[in-house]
């Protein structure tokens, strides 16, 4: 995206990609449908970015969902809005959009150098890094590339097999740049299930639940795995529970198995238990819990479940699931951490290296799934590219 903004302004752009092809993580993101952005109000979207919201807001307002959808349509890939407000290309896939995008960039004169890994900056005669000369390691060995500006978009450290391996972190730290530790975000959580529970329910979805950690609550469907839980509502709370696990050794999620019913409504339904009716049948018949939901209730409580309707209703609304860890960084959808916002200007230029800009997951921000990750990546790329143009004009 940054290359397109720069090339449109007449800048000669060379994209150096250390993988054999461009856009692999975009293709991965579109494997089950490319969720590009979201249609919720901008203020609500910005709030999703938590502590980084103030820094990202100007970029998202300048290039937000409307601009992103228009850009996609100009590439022959109109978008549609799903029932949840999420935005997808009409093809639902990333490949057609990526092909059209790369073809357009090439017609604009953008060149691509593949299998070329950025290794930092060349040193000036005085021994300090020279921000106008980048070093690369490629198929033809080490090279030095001089440029008026450099824009780094090296990603975080999730899914390293598609390119974002976090290898830049130590390079920037050695250059004196404050980089906050990269940690898994939007990831599965680990739970110490009993073998009998795993054998029967691994791979089974727990539908229409709400998961809460602290002040973070998200509805949706979760999937039981051999090691814990995954899925949209789990991803939404994963950063919050990760922080607790890192601090205390274990964390806890509260799962509402019937988010559409109040405690009082559950109590009224549970009041009608038939003679000799088993607890499982009672829960299934009166409040519609699925077999996996009932098993999760038993698993989380060690089968210490009250037969008293009021206590049972309260438990159904707040099933305590102990979390012993989260998925590793290389299995997370995204990563949190990155270059501290204090180390970049409003246009995401490195303060220590004037003329070098950064965008996307390299920056220290975090967001849930739902289109926010791609939107922020596109928005910061446009903002950084426009900042680079302003820099060029003044230098």
Predicted feature descriptions by range:
Residues 1-15, 378, 384-389:
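N-terminal Rossmann-like FAD-binding beta1-loop-alpha1 element of flavoenzymes
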Residues 114-131:
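A conserved short coil-to-beta-strand element within the FAD-binding core of flavoproteins
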Residues 8-9, 21, 42-44, 61, ...:
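Residue-level recognition of phosphate/Mg2+-coordinating polar/acidic sites
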Residues 56-66, 84-103, 113, 159-164, ...:
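Short beta-strand to alpha-helix junction loop
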Residues 16, 118-119, 143-164, 172-173, ...:
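Short hydrophobic core segments
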């Amino acid at each position: 995206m940054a290359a397109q903004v720069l090339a449109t302004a007449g800048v000669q752009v060379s994209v150096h990609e250390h993988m054999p092809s461009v856009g692999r993580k975009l293709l991965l993101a579109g494997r089950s449908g490319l969720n590009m952005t979201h249609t919720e109000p901008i203020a609500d979207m910005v709030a999703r970015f938590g502590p980084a919201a103030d820094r990202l807001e100007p970029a998202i307002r300048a290039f937000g969902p409307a601009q992103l959808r228009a850009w996609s349509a100009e590439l022959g890939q109109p978008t549609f809005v799903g029932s949840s407000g999420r935005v997808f290309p009409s093809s639902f896939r990333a490949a057609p959009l990526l092909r059209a995008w790369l073809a357009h960039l090439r017609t604009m004169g953008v060149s691509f150098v593949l299998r070329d890994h950025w290794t930092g900056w060349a040193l000036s005669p005085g021994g300090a890094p020279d921000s106008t000369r980048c070093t690369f390691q490629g198929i033809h060995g080490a090279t030095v590339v001089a440029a008026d500006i450099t824009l780094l978009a090296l990603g975080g450290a999730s899914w390293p097999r598609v390119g974002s391996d976090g290898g830049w972190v130590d390079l920037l730290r050695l250059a004196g740049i404050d980089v906050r530790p990269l940690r898994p975000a939007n990831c599965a959580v680990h739970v110490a299930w009993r073998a009998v529970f795993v054998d029967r329910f691994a791979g089974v979805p727990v539908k229409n639940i709400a998961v809460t950690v602290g002040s973070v609550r998200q509805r949706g469907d979760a999937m039981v795995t051999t090691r814990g839980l995954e899925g949209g509502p789990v991803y939404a709370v994963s950063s919050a529970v990760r922080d607790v696990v890192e601090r205390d050794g274990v964390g806890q999620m509260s799962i509402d198995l019937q988010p559409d019913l109040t405690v009082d409504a559950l109590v009224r339904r549970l009041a009608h238990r038939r003679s000799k009716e088993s607890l499982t049948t009672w829960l299934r018949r009166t409040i519609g819990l699925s077999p996996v939901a009932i098993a999760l209730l038993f698993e989380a409580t060690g089968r210490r479940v009250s037969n008293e309707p009021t206590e049972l209703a309260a438990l159904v609304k707040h099933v305590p699931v102990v979390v012993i860890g989260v998925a590793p960084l290389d299995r997370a959808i995204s990563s949190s951490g990155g270059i501290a916002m204090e180390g970049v200007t409003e246009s995401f230029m490195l303060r220590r290296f004037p003329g070098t800009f950064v965008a996307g997951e390299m920056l220290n921000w975090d967001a849930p799934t739902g289109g926010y990750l791609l939107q922020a990546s596109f928005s910061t790329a446009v903002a950084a590219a426009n900042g680079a143009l302003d820099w060029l004009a003044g230098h």
